[in-house]
From Swiss-Prot:
It is a peripheral membrane protein. One of its GO terms (molecular function) is proton-transporting ATP synthase activity, rotational mechanism. Signal peptide: none annotated. HAMAP family: ATP_synth_epsil_bac (MF_00530). This is ATP synthase epsilon chain, chloroplastic. The keyword Methyltransferase does not apply.
Length: 134
């Protein structure tokens, strides 16, 4: 038995295919979803989406959003998402370094919050790449 997973962002469809299982980062922690999972609607946190295909795992860097699971259908509406193999490692590392520098230079609460979110997004992209190479 399989699940149908659809991952959408404001710009494009990232994924629309059958999968065996997913591991999703939510605001209350990670959840694993197998066929016949109980229906749920949840906020999606900035983090990794792990997708199990027949014999391998695929990783997606998710930038937050919303997920709905019902009747073996999973729909994720993401603020942004990138499949790990599409991420340029050098660019991701540079973005992480810039985000770290911006956080240390942040003045005021708003700048600190924005810099912290940018840092979380950058770390997620780098983490997605590391999953490929390990």
């Amino acid at each position: 038995m399989t699940l149908n997973l659809c991952v959408l962002t404001p710009n494009r469809m990232i994924w629309d295919s059958e999968v065996k299982e997913i591991i999703l980062s939510t605001n209350s922690g990670q959840i694993g979803v197998l066929p016949n999972h109980a229906p749920i609607a949840t906020a999606v946190d900035i983090g990794l989406l792990r997708i199990r295909l027949k014999d391998r795992w695929l990783t997606v860097a998710l930038m937050g959003g919303f997920a709905r699971i019902s009747n073996n259908e999973i729909t994720i509406l993401g603020n942004g998402a990138e499949i790990s193999t599409d991420i340029d490692p050098q660019e991701a590392q540079q973005t992480l370094e810039i985000a770290e520098a911006n956080l240390s230079k942040a003045e005021g609460k708003r700048q600190a919050i924005e810099a912290n979110l940018a840092l979380r997004r950058a770390r997620t992209r780098v983490e997605a790449i590391k999953v490929i190479s390990s």
